């Protein structure tokens, strides 16, 4: 007598289909499962020691055809034809090139037409596909979950394990449904959604979970919007974030360089259509957010969970009942040099950064151009616009976006991680305040002493024009 398959979540389906060896034992004593990895993304920062480990053990890369590398974290976004000035950054980039050549790994170096941030390059090449497992030595690998992939950031020792075996020992995760019910109001983006989610559940609320984003608002999002949302799952403490594949997914993937072709495409779509959470499947936790109540969101503190609607005021720690939360807020406000009760819209900025693996895609740049068209960046404000890849830059140029950016007084750069993190020349100086479309606002994240407010691309552009945290609606009001 055959057993009846229990209803499963999307994450469970992908996990089960990739188990090479099932771990034994129960509870805390349970051994990890051995999971097969379909795609391994590599960059210059977390890979050098992993390759050294292969050499010491006399091993080769098991599946170089399932491994792809790109230079992104340390690369400059101007003068890319010149040697990298910082010796540590230069060494890491040169080491990646040598390692990829030695081990037969495909690399997209600076200046290459496909170079860019690893989490932008993978999807645009069609390498990220539904139902696959994706890993990278980078926290924001969760980006790829927008395609219905199980995508996780891993450490350097795990990078070595995947290079050597194309597998990874992992313990099963819990699952959490994030339901965004209803449609988003005009002017509200997926960046606002994920900031609101993190503010609701906290930076540790997703710890040990794979988040599945569901609901009408998610179904109505573009693939690039879904990538933004999944990208920041890690900021809620989650291991991964996922969205079930649908017609929007297939339309994005079709005809990408590495997407299946012809009959293989038809077979793939038929398989991908099964990647839905079954009716009756049980999540370990569920969260509901009414999309109609959301407005543009912005962070005020030093972690992504310290955020409020743009129309709100800087919170008062004295009104926070939880002592730990209150102490964290006091510390954050001291670092950010903010006074409780200050309207968020009255906070001035020195710098605006548009880019990163969160918001460096073509739709993000179009949103910025829509705001900047026939407007100027405010006096005293520096605006950097950095495409997530050279392909994104080329597309933006073909649409005339670069001309709009230049006319507004913004700096239009080459591809790279740029000001998302202080590992390349694009950094804040101590005390500078930045409205940033990136994913982390930790102390010193964008440069020692720099202060970061996380925002959507549209809010970033409006902020650049007004010189204070603003939405496009604020600019429209100022014209009347």
Swiss-Prot record:
Chain intervals with Polar residues compositional bias: 431-441
Signal peptide boundaries: none
Subunit organization: Heterodimer of LeuC and LeuD.
Name the UniProt record assigns to this protein: 3-isopropylmalate dehydratase large subunit
Entry EC no(s): 4.2.1.33
Listed PANTHER family: 3-ISOPROPYLMALATE DEHYDRATASE (PTHR43822:SF9), HOMOACONITASE, MITOCHONDRIAL-RELATED (PTHR43822)
InterPro entries the record matches: 3-IsopropMal_deHydase_lsu (IPR004430), Acnase/IPM_dHydase_lsu_aba_1/3 (IPR015931), Acoase/IPM_deHydtase_lsu_aba (IPR001030), Aconitase_4Fe-4S_BS (IPR018136), Aconitase_4Fe-4S_dom (IPR036008), IPM_dehydratase_rel_enz (IPR050067), IPMI_cat (IPR033941)
Cofactor: [4Fe-4S] cluster
Region Disordered: start-end pairs: 431-454
Chain sites annotated for binding [4Fe-4S] cluster: 357, 417, 420
Top-rank lineage group of the source organism: Bacteria
This protein's pathway: Amino-acid biosynthesis; L-leucine biosynthesis; L-leucine from 3-methyl-2-oxobutanoate: step 2/4
GO MF entries: 3-isopropylmalate dehydratase activity; 4 iron, 4 sulfur cluster binding; metal ion binding
Keywords of this entry: 4Fe-4S, Amino-acid biosynthesis, Branched-chain amino acid biosynthesis, Iron, Iron-sulfur, Leucine biosynthesis, Lyase, Metal-binding
Enzyme superclass (EC): lyase
UniProt-listed SUPFAM superfamilies: Aconitase iron-sulfur domain
Function of the protein: Catalyzes the isomerization between 2-isopropylmalate and 3-isopropylmalate, via the formation of 2-isopropylmaleate.
Organism, as annotated: Mycobacteroides abscessus (strain ATCC 19977 / DSM 44196 / CCUG 20993 / CIP 104536 / JCM 13569 / NCTC 13031 / TMC 1543 / L948) (Mycobacterium abscessus)
């Amino acid at each position: 007598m055959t057993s009846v398959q229990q209803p499963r979540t999307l994450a469970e389906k992908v996990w089960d289909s990739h188990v090479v060896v099932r771990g034994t034992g129960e509870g805390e004593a349970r051994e990890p499962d051995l999971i097969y990895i379909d795609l391994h993304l590599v960059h210059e920062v977390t890979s050098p020691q992993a390759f050294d480990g292969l050499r010491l053990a006399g091993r080769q890369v098991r599946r170089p055809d399932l491994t792809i590398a790109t230079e992104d974290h340390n690369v400059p976004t101007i003068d890319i034809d010149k040697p990298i000035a910082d010796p540590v950054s230069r060494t890491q980039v040169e080491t990646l090139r040598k390692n990829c050549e030695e081990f037969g790994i495909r690399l997209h170096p600076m200046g290459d037409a496909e170079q860019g941030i690893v989490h932008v390059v993978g999807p645009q090449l069609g390498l990220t596909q539904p139902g696959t497992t994706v890993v990278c030595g980078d926290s924001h690998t969760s980006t790829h979950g927008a395609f219905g992939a199980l995508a996780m950031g891993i450490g350097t020792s795990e990078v070595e394990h995947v290079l050597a075996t194309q597998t990874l020992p992992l313990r099963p995760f819990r699952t959490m449904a994030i339901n965004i019910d209803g449609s988003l109001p005009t002017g509200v983006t997926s960046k606002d959604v994920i900031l609101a989610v993190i503010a609701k559940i906290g930076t540790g609320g997703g710890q040990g979970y794979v988040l599945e984003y569901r609901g009408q608002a998610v179904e109505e999002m573009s693939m690039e919007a879904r990538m933004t949302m999944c990208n920041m799952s890690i900021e809620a403490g989650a291991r991964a974030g996922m969205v079930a594949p649908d017609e929007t997914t297939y339309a994005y993937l079709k005809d990408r360089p590495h997407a299946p072709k012809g009959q293989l495409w038809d077979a793939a779509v038929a398989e991908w259509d099964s990647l839905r959470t079954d009716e009756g499947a049980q999540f370990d936790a569920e969260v509901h957010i009414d999309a109609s109540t959301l407005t543009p969101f912005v962070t005020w503190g030093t972690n992504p969970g310290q955020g409020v609607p743009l129309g709100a005021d800087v919170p008062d720690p004295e009104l926070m009942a939880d002592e730990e939360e209150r102490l964290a807020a006091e510390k954050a406000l001291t670092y950010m040099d903010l006074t409780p009760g200050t309207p968020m819209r009255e906070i001035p900025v020195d710098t605006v950064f548009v880019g990163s693996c969160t918001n460096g895609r073509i739709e993000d740049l179009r949103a910025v151009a829509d705001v900047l068209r026939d407007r100027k960046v405010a006096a005293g404000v520096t605006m950097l616009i950095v495409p997530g890849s050279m392909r994104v830059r080329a597309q933006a140029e073909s649409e005339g976006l670069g001309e709009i950016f230049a006319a507004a007084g913004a700096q239009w750069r080459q591809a790279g991680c740029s000001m998302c993190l202080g590992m390349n020349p694009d950094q804040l100086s101590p005390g500078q305040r930045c409205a940033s479309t990136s994913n982390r606002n930790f102390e010193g994240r964008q440069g020692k002493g720099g202060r970061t407010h996380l925002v959507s691309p549209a809010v970033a552009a409006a902020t650049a024009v007004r010189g204070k945290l603003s939405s496009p609606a604020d600019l429209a009001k100022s014209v009347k």
